[in-house]
């Protein structure tokens, strides 16, 4: 059953480029091709092609941001934000979302077939960067015939991509909305990612990445997800959701999941294994750790001359991407002379707030996009 203001049934599309001999040259210097991106679109592109918004997903996300797939249960990962009358109003904007390079939800990644061997790439897949992901998105935007995006928007790793767009292609965007993200990872953020990677690689079923004919490192990937999920929540949200409540049905074993929070983490880990590739987890987290929006330089110096408007959003209880990192982004934008706004939402959900605080985000984003789009709405003209 479709929800109120839903975009309805959505079909995933595929775009393939970088065919030999024109493979994509990655930041590492290696070449990769052909490359396929899975993507979805919502709403309609206007005559001037001026109303396109690119949504950028986080680590475990995909192209399916809103609506439902035929014959499947559950809506897209940001369904509360995309649709008629919502933050990204599909009666006004043309919304695009693609699965990243290195992913496992339809886009080329480690689990894809290597044309040279006719087997999955596994660890023969080259290391990719956030910049490489954005470069692939730029090819998709060109394919769709869009010269300038109204906005690039994303939370967490999606926010990193938004910053990469702002730095790499400032002339191709009117605005950017980085949410709950950072210019670069802190040592603590890198440490959490490394523990997750080690959990996967310590699983005997990982087989140095060559597990595609077998069961795969399910235990290791589940543990990695459990670690990650702890960082997505806050102490307050865990206390409110679980407290120290014991489970009703406990298996007769000394170290079973006695507490509700233990059972919940195991459930999240086991479900994640069903839809995500372990090697993709390794590659994507490494790309996040290596990301530096300003390449070691002061961000405000890199952004000088940029005309895009920026809305930076953070959440008070987010300890994975604490608010000070978002404040650094906003400060750099203002020092560079950009029109930048910083907003901190008082939420108890932790890092997950960027997916859950739809009401607060909708209020901010609706007004911001209306302001950015004001020239076109009032005059009917748009500079590209």
Region annotations inferred by a language model:
Residues 1-55, 69, 382-384:
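Catalytic-loop region of hydrolases
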Residues 40, 44-114:
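N-terminal cap/lid subdomain of alpha/beta-hydrolase-fold enzymes
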Residues 118-120, 124, 131-151:
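Conserved acidic catalytic loop of the alpha/beta-hydrolase fold
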Residues 148-188:
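Conserved hydrolase catalytic core segment
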Residues 172, 178-271:
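Alpha/beta-hydrolase-fold enzymes
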Residues 296-299, 322-332:
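Short alpha-helix in the alpha/beta-hydrolase fold that links the catalytic acid
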Residues 306, 312-314:
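Short beta-strand/loop motif that positions the catalytic acidic residue
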Residues 334-384:
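Catalytic active-site module of serine/aspartate enzymes centered on a nucleophile-bearing elbow/loop
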């Amino acid at each position: 059953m479709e929800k109120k203001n839903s975009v309805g049934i959505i079909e995933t599309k595929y775009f393939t480029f970088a065919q030999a001999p024109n493979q994509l040259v990655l930041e590492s210097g290696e070449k990769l091709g052909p490359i396929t991106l899975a993507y979805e679109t919502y709403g309609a592109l206007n005559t001037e092609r001026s109303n396109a918004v690119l949504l950028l997903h986080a680590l475990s996300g995909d192209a399916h941001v809103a609506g439902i797939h035929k014959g499947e249960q559950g809506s897209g990962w940001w369904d509360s934000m995309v649709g008629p009358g919502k933050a990204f109003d599909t009666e006004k904007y043309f919304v695009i979302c693609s699965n990243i390079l290195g992913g496992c939800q339809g886009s080329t990644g480690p689990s894809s077939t290597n044309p040279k061997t006719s087997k999955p790439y596994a660890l023969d897949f080259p290391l990719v960067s956030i910049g490489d992901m954005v470069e692939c998105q730029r090819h998709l935007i060109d394919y769709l015939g869009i010269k300038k995006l109204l906005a690039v928007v994303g939370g967490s790793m999606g926010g990193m991509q938004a910053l990469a767009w702002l730095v790499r292609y400032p002339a191709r965007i009117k605005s950017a909305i980085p949410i709950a993200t950072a210019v670069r990872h802190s040592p603590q953020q890198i440490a959490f990612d490394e523990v997750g990677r080690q959990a996967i690689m310590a699983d005997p079923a990982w087989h140095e990445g060559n597990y595609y004919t077998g069961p795969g490192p399910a235990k290791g990937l589940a543990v990695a997800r459990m670690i990650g999920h702890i960082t997505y929540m806050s102490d307050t949200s865990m206390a409110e959701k679980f407290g120290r409540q014991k489970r009703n049905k406990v298996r007769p074993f000394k170290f079973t999941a006695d507490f509700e929070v233990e059972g919940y983490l195991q459930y999240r880990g086991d479900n994640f294994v069903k839809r995500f590739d372990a090697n993709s987890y390794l590659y994507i987290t490494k790309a996040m750790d290596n990301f530096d929006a300003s390449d070691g330089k002061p961000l405000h110096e890199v952004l000088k001359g940029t005309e895009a408007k920026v809305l930076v959003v953070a959440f008070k209880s987010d300890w994975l991407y604490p608010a000070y990192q978002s404040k650094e982004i906003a400060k750099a934008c203002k020092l560079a002379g950009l029109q930048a706004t910083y907003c901190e939402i008082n939420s108890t959900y932790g890092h997950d707030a960027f997916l859950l605080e739809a009401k607060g985000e909708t209020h901010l984003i609706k007004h911001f996009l209306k302001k950015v789009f004001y020239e076109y709405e009032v005059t009917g003209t748009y500079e590209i």
